[in-house]
Amino acid sequence: MGENMIKSEDLVFKYVNAEEQTEKVAINHVSMEVKKGEFLVILGHNGSGKSTMAKHMNALLLPSGGKMYVDGLDTSDIENLWEVRRRAGMVFQNPDNQLVATIVEEDVAFGPENLGVDPKEIRERVDDSLKAVGMYEYRKHAPHLLSGGQKQRIAIAGILAMRPKCIVLDEPTAMLDPSGRNEVMKTIKEVNKKFGITIILITHYMDEAAQADRIIVMDKGEKVMEGVPREIFSQVEKIKSIGLDVPQVTELAYELQKEGVDISTEILNIDEMVNALCQLK
């Protein structure tokens, strides 16, 4: 992983509260970098600024101050908007709001058609994208008959068909059941590893965040923590003071350590917990 896919410099975003006629700062001088090919999670509770940050990454929102660069392109330059949105695709929380056609393959073709891609290549892109997310056999189905997890995979296929360099996912599993969440997370990781596409996942699920290469934690519009998952989640008290939880096994290790058990809090999954417990005398 070399150069940056996403870079913000001292980013500020303010919006006006129409009722109170006051300005609210949603992002307060945040600088961050996301390397090409990286899988980054941005964590934070409601109102932390994480979704506002995500919307800057494909120029749905533009900075009130500071800069946001997507693959080296300044999002504040109006001439860059089309190219920024082509390079950074976005998947939202509600799958039903993202599907536009009555047949799955037509929905996936919608983006490339709007880019003016040749029909023969569109056919190839649609098939390749549906295979990549494990939904090729549903290509002739009606999207509204699919499960929530399947719909989100179709939404991801629609972004893949546009050949982006980066996909920003704003709480894509928030409305899904556990099996749907697992389907979507598996797809996200495969897209990242197989195609080298940069992934930025906005979430408040700790087990999802634990699977990332790196985590940024936001609180009250500011970046308050940054590091690899083990580094972040081992700071249990700090995470809790921000109003977040840690993965269940990390919480268990923390409670055991408090009771005097010689165990690390840098435990992220059940296998690691089993190994750590087996080594205790």
From Swiss-Prot:
Protein location: Cell membrane
Membrane topology classification: Peripheral membrane protein
A single MF term (Gene Ontology): ATP hydrolysis activity
CDD domains: ABC_cobalt_CbiO_domain1 (cd03225)
Keyword Cell membrane in record: yes
InterPro entries: AAA+_ATPase, ABC_transporter-like_ATP-bd, ABC_transporter-like_CS, ABC_transpr_CbiO/EcfA_su, ECF_ABC_transporter_ATP-bd, EcfA_1, P-loop_NTPase
Residue ranges occupied by any ABC transporter domain in the UniProt entry: 6-245
Enzyme Commission number(s) from the entry: 7.-.-.-
The keyword Membrane appears for this protein: yes
Cellular component, GO annotation: ATP-binding cassette (ABC) transporter complex
Alphabetical UniProt keywords: ATP-binding, Cell membrane, Membrane, Nucleotide-binding, Translocase, Transport
Binding positions (ATP): 44-51
PANTHER family with a match to the protein in the record: ENERGY-COUPLING FACTOR TRANSPORTER ATP-BINDING PROTEIN ECFA1 (PTHR43553:SF24), HEAVY METAL TRANSPORTER (PTHR43553)
Family affiliation: Belongs to the ABC transporter superfamily. Energy-coupling factor EcfA family.
Record's function text: ATP-binding (A) component of a common energy-coupling factor (ECF) ABC-transporter complex. Unlike classic ABC transporters this ECF transporter provides the energy necessary to transport a number of different substrates.
Assembly and interaction partners: Forms a stable energy-coupling factor (ECF) transporter complex composed of 2 membrane-embedded substrate-binding proteins (S component), 2 ATP-binding proteins (A component) and 2 transmembrane proteins (T component).
Name used for this protein in its record: Energy-coupling factor transporter ATP-binding protein EcfA1
Organism, scientific name: Clostridium perfringens (strain 13 / Type A)
